[in-house]
Amino acid sequence: MASTEEQYDLKIVKVEEDPIWDQETHLRGNNFSGQEASRQLFRQFCYQETPGPREALSRLRELCHQWLRPEIHTKEQILELLVLEQFLTILPEELQAWVREHHPESGEEAVAVVEDLEQELSEPGNQAPDHEHGHSEVLLEDVEHLKVKQEPTDIQLQPMVTQLRYESFCLHQFQEQDGESIPENQELASKQEILKEMEHLGDSKLQRDVSLDSKYRETCKRDSKAEKQQAHSTGERRHRCNECGKSFTKSSVLIEHQRIHTGEKPYECEECGKAFSRRSSLNEHRRSHTGEKPYQCKECGKAFSASNGLTRHRRIHTGEKPYECKVCGKAFLLSSCLVQHQRIHTGEKRYQCRECGKAFIQNAGLFQHLRVHTGEKPYQCSQCSKLFSKRTLLKKHQKIHTGERP
């Protein structure tokens, strides 16, 4: 009986002989690209694609074997693959996409990619032009949120993992708050784009424990309610940051903003030592340890630990799509979906196959294309059992049995 590796090679040959595939299927790359394709097929395998549970389990075993290749990998190498995958999983979504594009082959390589990004965004020479300062500052703070205080004992490992899982879920695009607004900018570099949904916000007003000198206290007392209302109505921004020139309508927001430049994080979690520049961020972070989910959807009962998570979830019920494409008018539920859609107009193809070099606008296109190299054909004809890599090819084939003209 042929070994699994031989079966894998035979499967590739079969795909290459299939007339459906074009000439790109004859290109073979390094092991990592094929390994990544097998990993994705294993992780995204659907139960509905098999006749029953026994077939599903058998198919999962086969896909897992193709991914981990125990016949050629040691136990340590297999463990490293699993740890690497989990590390990428706990990263915030947009940062995860950025790291995956670098195709790290180990956990250390993945960490190096994240650290390089942190360093580049923290260097003054890599900041955006003056009109983009506000967004670049937020990005810098976002990267700082990814740093976890190192502890020598294994006891601290689980809280940190839980914390990173939570932050990957609750961080999102920095929106208008307390008189400060960040304008949309479609010209941001890709390194900034990947982090644009990672700023942590809450419903409640920000509460600060700020040590203010006597001069500032006197100034606050002299500010009348009418002056504040006038500033809000006219959009006047009287409080200017001396570091980057960004202006704010409220002095309290300016003080908080200045922590981006100073790196001050006065609010520290007593559980894991993670520090934050905002008290509200600390309060929401604590829920990663307690498991508390106070924000519940009235429609379906689903609960969330962060208010912004509930806000985005509600759009599923209301049908709200606040992010609209300025070119064609198509609207989207999430800003990340809008960014991906806009590549259709710009022609940008950021998802590239490591096997043959072919590029795609969307990640879904790349995932489907990977089946060319792995030989995966998950769609089976119920009439003749012929297999296909695409659902559209299966539907086209089924017309042969129905007599319908293709």
Curated annotation (Swiss-Prot):
**Metal-binding listed as a keyword:** yes
| Domain SCAN box intervals | 39-121
Organism listed in the record: Homo sapiens
Q: Name one GO biological process term.
A: regulation of transcription by RNA polymerase II
Q: Name one GO molecular function term.
A: sequence-specific double-stranded DNA binding
Q: Span of the secretion signal?
A: none
Family label: Belongs to the krueppel C2H2-type zinc-finger protein family.
CDD domains reported in the protein's UniProt record: SCAN
Q: Which branch of life, at top level?
A: Eukaryota
Q: Where are the zinc fingers (C2H2-type)?
A: 239-261, 267-289, 295-317, 323-345, 351-373, 379-401
Role this protein plays: May function as a transcription factor. May be involved in the development of multiple embryonic organs.
Q: Which InterPro entries does this one have?
A: SCAN_dom (IPR003309), SCAN_sf (IPR038269), Znf_C2H2_sf (IPR036236), Znf_C2H2_type (IPR013087)
What is one term from the GO cellular component aspect held by the record? nucleus
Its protein name is Zinc finger and SCAN domain-containing protein 31
Which Pfam family, giving just one, matches this sequence? zf-C2H2
Where it sits in the cell: the answer is: Nucleus
The principal localisation class reads nucleus
Q: In which tissues is it expressed?
A: Expressed at high levels in the lung, liver, and kidney, while weakly expressed in intestine, brain, muscle, cholecyst, heart, and pancreas.
* Location in chain, cross-link Glycyl lysine isopeptide (Lys-Gly) (interchain with G-Cter in SUMO2): K14, K149, K191, K205, K215, K250, K358
